[in-house]
């Protein structure tokens, strides 16, 4: 039985994060590709972020350019909009940034919804 394919969409914030991080971490696209493949296969890895009102998940991604394991890796945050549509919200290096504020994630979703009715 085939798994339903999920449409994974990188929001502008996520794309900007990639452009910034790729300058320092050349293998970032290879590092996140397995996660994107999991999402496209309908899996929802990571921990749900509480207190936002949206089904948002945060997970650790190993940074192969940084030999500190997952704790020195990236945090990828995505929004499970529907069962067949996932939005990649943001991506950051844990060694360069603390946790993202829940309100910022909500703002990213609402800004995208306003500009794409």
Regions found by a protein language model. Name each.
Residues 58, 73-81, 85-91:
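Short, hydrophobic/aromatic-rich beta-strand segments within well-structured domains
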Residues 1-68, 82-83, 95-117:
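Basic, Lys/Arg-enriched alpha-helical interface segments
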């Amino acid at each position: 039985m085939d798994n339903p394919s999920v449409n994974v969409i990188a929001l502008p914030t996520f794309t900007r994060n990639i452009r910034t991080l790729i300058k320092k971490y050349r293998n970032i696209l290879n590092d996140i590709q397995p996660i994107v493949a999991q999402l496209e296969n309908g899996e929802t890895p990571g921990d749900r972020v509480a207190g936002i009102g949206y089904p948002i998940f945060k997970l650790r991604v190993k940074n192969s350019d940084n030999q500190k394991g997952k704790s020195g890796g990236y945090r990828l945050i995505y929004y499970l909009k529907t069962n067949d549509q996932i939005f990649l919200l943001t991506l950051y290096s844990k060694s360069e940034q603390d946790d993202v504020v829940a309100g910022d994630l909500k703002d990213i979703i609402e800004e995208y919804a306003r500009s794409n009715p």
